[in-house]
Regions:
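Phosphate/diphosphate ligand-binding glycine-rich loop within oxidoreductases
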Residues: 49-138
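Rossmann-like adenosine-cofactor binding region
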Residues: 189, 193-290
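N-terminal glycine-/charge-rich "phosphate-binding" loop or analogous flexible N-terminal tail
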Residues: 1-52, 326
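Short, well-ordered coil/turn residues at beta-beta hairpins
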Residues: 14, 56, 74, 224-227, ...
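Glycine-rich NAD(P)-binding loop of Rossmann-like domains
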Residues: 123-176
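Rossmann-like dinucleotide-binding domain for NAD(H)/NADP(H)
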Residues: 246, 252-341
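Structural alpha-helical scaffold elements that stabilize or flank donor/cofactor-binding regions
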Residues: 43-46, 61-64, 213-214, 239, ...
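Oxidoreductase and adenylate-handling cofactor-binding alpha/beta cores
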Residues: 105-124, 182-186, 316-324, 329
Length: 341
């Protein structure tokens, strides 16, 4: 393959994308050459003089590149995308973050509402045709009990405006979680390595080394962090001991952030009240795992980001970053390769 004219940039796509999306990429590329590689051999030839790449880069492809400036990952998470040579390479790397923030935040609030109002328990009771308020039917409040009487049923149903929600990782997803929780009147706490505030919602985002404070204060602890070297197994037995025994853990980040055996032990012992889990250290979660049988655990099969809106957002992010590269600008989703985000 002949080299590109010096004035013309080249974008290589592999695996190939369909024609309607390719047409939009060509329009966004604004004079760039766009090669939609149908197979690995074509991609290996095409990467030699490519300036930009979208798709799954491999060590073999990267080694053949001679002028690569920018790589666009098709995913938001990078733990399975990065490799040492890519980290050391001078090219810029961007990901697909920001596509799922509102959707995942909705999923988190679903977990929160289920635990606060015992909806998961009532669903099981409904399937058994049982009328059984959590706290006991005999403990229902009556006017005869007099003013200021709080029943056992009342105590087993949380008032969200009295609860504190702690977010571990206040990035795009974490910020949306904070906004939704604030709308319910909850007190919000956050820890983040960058200490990004959420204006008008959370002004005091603390550094990650203050995680113990957040755990001690929170009624709901939400993991919204990506998998990075710093977050691998961040939650172990020690962190569960630091949580309130009445607190719930919610993980929509990455499964490997939580030591699954330690979490299981904390739930079995009553060290924490329950867990809402969308991601796991091992996926699918084995059918014989104890978590499946726990009434205080809600399991969803890695679907927190599922939405019919995601595909259009994915394409929009790609097109915007292609436009920016063609114009000599940084991508909007530029990442720090050494930090994985």
């Amino acid at each position: 393959m002949s080299a590109n004219p010096e004035s013309q940039k080249k974008l290589l796509i592999f695996p190939a994308i369909d024609e309607p999306r390719l047409k939009q990429v060509r329009e966004a590329a604004s004079g760039m050459s766009v090669v939609n590689a149908p197979d690995a051999a074509t991609a290996l030839r095409g990467i030699v003089d490519a300036d930009a790449f979208f798709g799954k880069i491999t060590p073999e492809l990267l080694a053949a590149a001679t002028r690569l400036e920018w790589v666009q990952s098709p995913t938001a998470s990078l733990e399975h995308y990065l490799f040492p040579e890519l980290i050391e390479h001078p090219c810029q790397l961007s990901n697909m973050r920001g596509l799922f923030s509102d959707v995942i935040a909705d999923h988190v609030m679903g977990f929160v509402l289920c635990f606060a109002r015992n909806l998961h328990r009532y669903l099981r009771l409904q399937q058994q045709a049982r009328w059984a308020p959590v706290g006991g039917e005999d403990e229902r409040s009556t006017f005869a009990a007099g003013p200021a009487f709080v029943s056992a049923i009342d105590r087993r149903h949380l008032h969200l405006a009295d609860c504190t929600l702690g977010v571990v990782g206040v990035g795009n997803i974490g910020a949306e979680i904070c906004r939704r929780a604030a709308a319910f009147g909850m007190t919000i706490r956050g820890v983040d390595p960058v200490c990004r505030s959420v204006p008008g919602i959370v002004d005091d985002v603390r550094p990650t080394d203050r995680l113990p404070e957040l755990l001690a204060e929170s009624d709901f602890v939400v993991i919204a962090a990506p998998h990075t070297p710093a977050t691998f197994k961040l939650f172990r037995a020690e962190q569960f001991r630091q949580m309130k025994p009445t607190a719930y853990l919610i993980n929509i980040g990455r499964g490997v952030i939580v030591d699954l055996a330690d979490l299981t032990a904390a739930l079995e012992s009553g060290e924490i009240a329950g867990a809402g889990l969308d991601v796991f250290e091992t996926e699918p979660l084995p059918a014989d795992h104890p978590l499946w049988g726990m009434e205080n655990v809600i399991i969803t099969p890695h679907v927190a980001a599922a939405s019919p809106r995601i595909a259009e957002r994915h394409l929009a992010t790609l097109l915007e970053n292609v436009r920016r590269f063609a114009a000599g600008q940084d991508p909007v989703t530029l990442v720090d390769k050494r930090r994985w985000f």
